[in-house]
From Swiss-Prot:
This is Protein GrpE. Its main location: cytoplasm. Keywords: Chaperone, Cytoplasm, Stress response. InterPro entries: GrpE, GrpE_coiled_coil, GrpE_head. NCBIfam families: PRK14140.1, PRK14159.1. The keyword Chaperone applies. The gene is grpE. GO terms for biological process: protein folding. It comes from Campylobacter jejuni subsp. jejuni serotype O:6 (strain 81116 / NCTC 11828). GO terms for molecular function: adenyl-nucleotide exchange factor activity; protein homodimerization activity; protein-folding chaperone binding; unfolded protein binding. Participates actively in the response to hyperosmotic and heat shock by preventing the aggregation of stress-denatured proteins, in association with DnaK and GrpE. It is the nucleotide exchange factor for DnaK and may function as a thermosensor. Unfolded proteins bind initially to DnaJ; upon interaction with the DnaJ-bound protein, DnaK hydrolyzes its bound ATP, resulting in the formation of a stable complex. GrpE releases ADP from DnaK; ATP binding to DnaK triggers the release of the substrate protein, thus completing the reaction cycle. Belongs to the GrpE family.
Length: 176
């Protein structure tokens, strides 16, 4: 019986050792799975934070470019009154040589002024046949045989924009 007992104890020891190895392996597997999960979560957080950082960088760059493009908007808008005055001076009829020379000088000044405005992104809004509330300001409506309803009849004051932003709409009369 002692041999059986010895054999039984040996078998128990082997089973116990095997179970311990198996338990240890299970613990290692569980730990490895937990670590992998933690790693995956941290990697995901890193990727999201990195993507958010890149988006912030792009947005800041876009805002910077926009601020630069529109920085002179208020100043340019104020200069439009000067432009209107120069254009009005050009439209005055001249009857003597001195007045013609002055008008020529004003025209040269106006041309230079327009080039400088254009250099800084200020552009004349092109005349459109159809009324566009994004570009035009209707001052009044008129009956017109030559125009369809909603068409621009007369430009009363030129409009200007910087890039795609209107700084002064074109003031127009519109056909009824």
């Amino acid at each position: 019986m002692s041999e059986q007992k010895q054999e039984f104890e040996n078998e128990n020891a082997e089973n116990s050792e095997h179970l311990q190895d198996e338990n240890l392996q299970n613990i290692e597997d569980v730990e490895q799975n937990r670590l992998q999960k933690d790693y995956d979560e941290l990697k995901d957080k890193y990727m999201r934070a990195n993507a958010e950082f890149e988006n912030i960088k792009k947005r800041m760059e876009k805002e910077k470019l926009s601020a630069m493009a529109y920085a002179n908007e208020s100043f340019a808008k104020d200069l439009l009154d000067v432009l209107d005055a120069l254009e009005a001076a050009i439209n005055v009829e001249c009857h003597d040589e001195i007045s013609l020379k002055i008008k020529e000088g004003v025209q040269n000044t106006l041309d230079l002024f327009l080039k400088k405005l254009e250099k800084h992104g200020v552009a004349l809004i092109k005349e459109e046949k159809e009324f566009d509330p994004n570009l035009h300001e209707a001052m009044f409506h008129v009956d017109s045989q030559n125009h369809q309803s909603g068409e621009v009849v007369t430009v009363l004051q030129k409009g200007y924009k910087i890039a795609d932003r209107v700084i002064r709409p074109t003031k127009v009369s519109v056909a009824k």
